[in-house]
UniProtKB/Swiss-Prot annotation:
PANTHER family: PHOSPHOGLYCOLATE PHOSPHATASE. Pathway: Organic acid metabolism; glycolate biosynthesis; glycolate from 2-phosphoglycolate: step 1/1. InterPro entries: HAD-like_hydrolase_sf, HAD-like_sf, HAD-SF_hydro_IA, HAD_2, HAD_sf, PGP-like_dom2, PGPase_prok. This is Phosphoglycolate phosphatase. GO terms for molecular function: metal ion binding; phosphoglycolate phosphatase activity. It comes from Xylella fastidiosa (strain 9a5c). The keyword Metal-binding applies. The keyword Cell inner membrane does not apply. It comes from the Bacteria. Pfam families: HAD_2. Its cofactor is Mg(2+). Its EC number is 3.1.3.18.
Amino acid sequence: MPLNEPSSNAFPRTVLFDLDGTLLDSAPDMLATANAMLAARGRAPITLAQLRPVISIGTFRILAVAFPELDAAAIQGLIPEFLQRYEALIGSVSKPFDGVEMMLDALECAGTVWGIVTNKPEFLARLILPLLGWTSRCAVLIGGDTLAERKPHPLPLLTAAERIGVMPTDCVYVGDDVSDIQAARAAGMPSMVALWGYRSHEDNPMTWQADTLVEQPHLLSRPDVWPST
């Protein structure tokens, strides 16, 4: 899919990223967690192909794929077990997408400040940062339970910008799900769709009204790809 026409020849002052499906390929750890729960119940495992399209949506949808026969209340009741098992496995298989480290290095060399705004529980996201060597590099981390609202509400993005000390219009938000783009638009923040992320076949990012679509992380090492801020 072609990129939208870029409108800037400079890196943004600040970049905020989604985590799962944007910076981190966390699908293997989440698959291992779901399959451990299934094995504990004598059930057959699910596949990565089944799980990938729903990872950006959240734990509830992951469990709905693993346990399709359960109603919403029963699935909700499994979430604490999933989070406990996932905490034990976190970072064991997951790694940044190819090109992410190159991109982050390029941003930092240009003086760009970057942070993470994710719907993953904050304590889990914070466990990941030291495993990747990102603790001192990430200027702000907002999780799905950090505030009273989560994406697609704009509050997490607005709070991240405030904590860094910049205006929302000085930031670009990069994510792989429609809720990421909705949050950015509501916050008045330029946005980019990470096309390498966890989209389902039914998703059409061309309809999300992002400023830019980008195919691979390494392309974000180029200043001309970024939308203007």
